[in-house]
Design a protein with these regions (language model features):
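Outer-membrane beta-barrel strand-turn architecture
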Residues: 3, 45, 55-59, 103-105, ...
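N-terminal periplasmic/intermembrane-space "pro-region" immediately following the signal or transit peptide
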Residues: 1-28, 34
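Oxyanion-binding "anion nests"
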Residues: 217-229
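Transmembrane beta-strands of outer-membrane beta-barrel proteins
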Residues: 9-15, 63-67, 109-111, 164-166, ...
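Extracytoplasmic
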Residues: 4, 10, 46-48, 94, ...
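Glycine- and aromatic-enriched membrane insertion/assembly motifs of diderm outer-membrane
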Residues: 8, 37-74
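Surface-exposed coil loops of outer-membrane beta-barrel proteins
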Residues: 22-43, 74-191, 200-207
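Beta-propeller domains
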Residues: 198, 206-210, 219-222
């Protein structure tokens, strides 16, 4: 029982109805290929059901884990973006699955290894702890930002206002499939200027070429949050 006492269980469910006033002849992809989750016109959908099991690592020396299990119509599109073939019948996805260790370095170096959601972008696919109240998403969310990475990351708080993160992953743009022998790198600097202003700078880069081909890609991203009250 002591083994399970610190494990938290979370979850949520989302359903939707989508309508296109242009009344396309073919409802599938009726809202344009440039959409992500809200493509199909005049359609009810169960978008996502999520179950999260997590053991946090708040103290130096703690070992934990996180597993996010998801089911719904959103996931064939997400899996395709991660380098797998689109399969509309495959509605299940392990969105995150990693082990954590709060290493005894300074005030604590947080290390995660496995599959985790990206640190890049203003719109993420994080579940209950990163809830997004809008159903439709921006162009950057679906056709630029990666969704997840498979690898290892380490984060460290230099102060209450400044933190840094480094990552080594299979692919710089989020694919779970490693199509070459190289590894991608990623980094983040997050600074809270005041109660109403925070700045986050993100980067990921590496070779995206298949096999022995060299095709380097770099992804730069900045997020500035401004509070108006």
């Amino acid at each position: 029982l002591l083994l399970f006492k610190d494990i938290e269980v979370h979850g949520f469910a989302s359903t939707s109805y989508n309508y296109n006033f242009e009344n396309p002849a073919t409802p599938t992809n009726g809202n344009s290929q440039n959409r992500v989750y809200d493509r199909d016109a005049n359609t009810f959908k169960f978008d996502n059901g999520e179950l999260v099991l997590v053991k946090e690592t708040p103290k130096v020396g703690d070992v934990g884990f996180r597993t996010d299990l998801n089911f719904g119509s959103n996931y064939p599109y997400m899996n395709a973006s991660n380098g797998t073939t689109m399969n509309l019948e495959n509605d299940f996805d392990v969105q995150q699955g990693y082990v954590s260790y709060n290493a005894p370095i300074g005030s604590g170096l947080q290390i995660d290894m496995g599959k985790f959601t990206t640190h890049i972008g203003a719109e993420l696919i994080d579940g209950h702890d990163g809830w997004n109240y809008n159903h439709s998403r921006s162009y950057l969310f679906g056709y630029a930002n990666p969704f997840v990475h498979s690898g290892v990351r380490a984060g460290y708080s230099l102060s209450d206002d400044l933190s840094v993160l480094g990552m080594v992953a299979n692919h710089p743009l989020g694919s779970e499939v490693d199509n070459n022998n190289g590894k991608a790198l990623g980094a983040q600097i997050a600074y809270t200027v005041s109660d109403n202003l925070s700045i986050v700078l993100n980067w990921a880069g590496g070779n995206t070429g298949a096999g022995n081909a060299v095709q380097h890609a770099n992804f730069w991203d900045s997020v500035i949050d401004i509070g108006l009250t």
